[in-house]
Amino acid sequence: MRQRILTLLLGLAVLVTAGCGFHLRGTTQVPSEMKTLILDSSDPYGPLTRAVREQLRLSDVTIVKDAKRKDLPSLRIIGATESQDTASIFQDGKTAEYQMVLTVQAQVLIPGHDLYPLNVKVFRSFFDNPLTALAKDSEQEIIRQEMREQAAQQLVRKLLTVHAAEEETQQKAAAAGEKAASRVDQ
């Protein structure tokens, strides 16, 4: 009896989560118009560009290497800045905790349409333990890499907002065209 109730509850939980559109985190459903795009960066082999390229591949996006093509959407990574601010201090006035900020500026260029800016900010805190001076550098590098990966995930997710903005622009243009056509007919 107890086994049947557990099986029933587990089955119900699966149905509820599947029915509401729940998906495990991981890949982002990129719009079909952006399934093939050009990834353009001033540092094509840098860690941020590699992280963005990996996230695009995980989302089944084909990356075209020919940056001269004008018929494909283009994701351009304009720049990234890292900053580090003091979040707390020890009694002796030395920094105890840093807030690390990674800001990424990018833009999506859709041929024959607009240019859409994308901005991503990722925040992390880092505890500066003076007793572990040697481990600090490697820990900071691990945190920076995680921040780059998180920024790359956010950029790929923001492609959905670009797609929505593009559709909205097309709908407004179609509505304006219909209004103009109806005025001419009258």
From Swiss-Prot:
InterPro entries: LPS_assembly_LptE (IPR007485). Residues 1-19 form the signal peptide. Disulfide bonds: none annotated. The keyword Calcium does not apply. Keywords: Cell outer membrane, Lipoprotein, Membrane, Palmitate, Signal. It is a lipid-anchor. One of its GO terms (cellular component) is cell outer membrane. It is found in: Cell outer membrane. Belongs to the LptE lipoprotein family. Component of the lipopolysaccharide transport and assembly complex. Interacts with LptD. This is LPS-assembly lipoprotein LptE. It comes from Serratia proteamaculans (strain 568).
